[in-house]
């Protein structure tokens, strides 16, 4: 039996439509138009594509977008000065610095310079900390997008065994906090985890984000599990694949996200939701 596909494109379009309707209502109520500032440093082709996708989503939602494309040679001081200006600009609701930054720049210092109420990526330690103490403000986009997908497909994590493979600051750690908030019993696996196959085999809900093509094998997966593949990897032939061996996994899982078309669209939809939320925080 083949798994039901979890369609992130479809769910994300509904969420974007809801944001667009909320933005239109704000205009009727004479509230300011939400505004997202996106900063891109250097010429990384993948980053340029991601930034373009975010601009397109802003247009669909009626969110104003400002774009700052800086040369590879930009210094730490110059980048921090731009963040300071955007923090001080009352018209800007959200600030996004596209990662990865060139190697000579300190990404963590830049992320921590963004005002937490404008941190629409949800990466600032303040926002991760609020999520940890069950008081979320700006929630990291990919983990929150995963939770939205689960909700859309009627999957309640409460009481389930959830296993997160990968412990990055962007996906794995905040994903574990999101699942904990939803009252799942959460295990996080990382490079020092022993018996990874056993951990995966016990998962009712499996979320994988390690950036290694086909890392999790289909035969490891518990029959009837829900599999969320956050990975997106480009192979030598130009095709995209996730971190889970899709063809074998779909024969065991009850539901699974495809790559592409699963989690990716949800990340951008959540970014738009966060920008709208930031605008509402700035209304007062």
From Swiss-Prot:
Record Gene3D superfamilies: Leucine Dehydrogenase, chain A, domain 1, NAD(P)-binding Rossmann-like Domain
Residues the record lists as binding NADP(+): 166-168, 191, 232
GO biological process, one term: methionine biosynthetic process
EC number(s) from the headed UniProt entry: 1.5.1.5, 3.5.4.9
Reaction catalysis annotation: (6R)-5,10-methylene-5,6,7,8-tetrahydrofolate + NADP(+) = (6R)-5,10-methenyltetrahydrofolate + NADPH; (6R)-5,10-methenyltetrahydrofolate + H2O = (6R)-10-formyltetrahydrofolate + H(+)
SUPFAM superfamilies documented for this protein: Aminoacid dehydrogenase-like, N-terminal domain, NAD(P)-binding Rossmann-fold domains
Name the UniProt record assigns to this protein: Bifunctional protein FolD
Gene this chain is encoded by: folD
